[in-house]
Swiss-Prot record:
Binds 1 [4Fe-4S] cluster. The cluster is coordinated with 3 cysteines and an exchangeable S-adenosyl-L-methionine. Residues 54-273 form the Radical SAM core domain. Homodimer. Catalyzes the conversion of dethiobiotin (DTB) to biotin by the insertion of a sulfur atom into dethiobiotin via a radical-based mechanism. Keywords: 2Fe-2S, 4Fe-4S, Biotin biosynthesis, Iron, Iron-sulfur, Metal-binding, S-adenosyl-L-methionine, Transferase. Its cofactor is [4Fe-4S] cluster; [2Fe-2S] cluster. This is Biotin synthase. Signal peptide: none annotated. The gene is bioB.
Amino acid sequence: MNISMGISSLSVINGSALPRHNWAREEAQALYDLPFPDLVFQAQSIHRTSFDPNHVETASLLSIKTGGCAEDCGYCSQSAHYKTDVKATKLMAHDDVVATARRAKESGAGRFCMAAAWRNPKEKDLERICHMVSAVKELGMETCATLGMLTREQADKLRAAGLDFYNHNVDTSPEFYGKIITTRTLQDRIETLAHARESGLKVCCGGIVGLGEQVEDRLGMLVLLANLAEHPESVPINQWNEVKGVPVNATAEAPDPIAFVRMIAVARIMMPKSVVRLSAGRQYMSDEMQALCMLAGANSIFIGDVLLTTKNPQTTKDAALLERLGMTSRFDEVATDKANPVSSRAI
């Protein structure tokens, strides 16, 4: 039996995908190198053991504090180290955040993520964010935050406020990491993930492809994530968006669409119970490419015209694509509620 074929087949026992935490780079590479039909077939087969293959999760992302970040992430328009078009703002007002969350829910989002461009939150700001989290939770939405590094005590406060998920990406492989970030170590990120876990928060953690890394780096990132003590509940995969004024522009190049789909498929096989999210960069993807990603196991998208400081497909376009594919999402629930306003208010 071909070893690469055996790797994924051994991940499914009695119809259930069993997560592993001891992946080797060679195994990830063997999966990636499979003939495309075999790779996508295996990914879809494993996907079906844990998820409804015809359902896509929809989430919304809001920058509640933009720009002026002390970190030097070489891809980020919000870093204070670079001259970009992004202007630094203060933390948004509570009522504005809640109103945005309400509109996101009415548009079809089931989860609302609040992002702040900080190295780490100050206590006075964290208190305000905890109130925002509680208010968004009262709307009946799942809550997520990405605020930079956290202490265990800060994670505990967010969890007590009702936060469900904490996002803190590893961005890339351990080998490539130092080429794009110098002000925050990869270990800093791992420790923040541990603090979130210890507090009872679910973890959202992924990275970016197209920063100038090699395929081995992309697979190295997936191996890093898959070998964590617990797999992230959500794995966002971002495709590089060109940003004016950042140093990564010198080496960045969006991956070939087939290469990106292969990345999604390997992520699905290696982390069979994690939600795999198509994140930034979808505005550059054709409908056909997104459909292939979903066939390969991607089952979540961010909706809304803007993701932090970058563009995103219009919500109406996303709804139309999922309808064409015959896939379900919260868009269907919203449409039903609008068609039956009396009954939906009574629920």
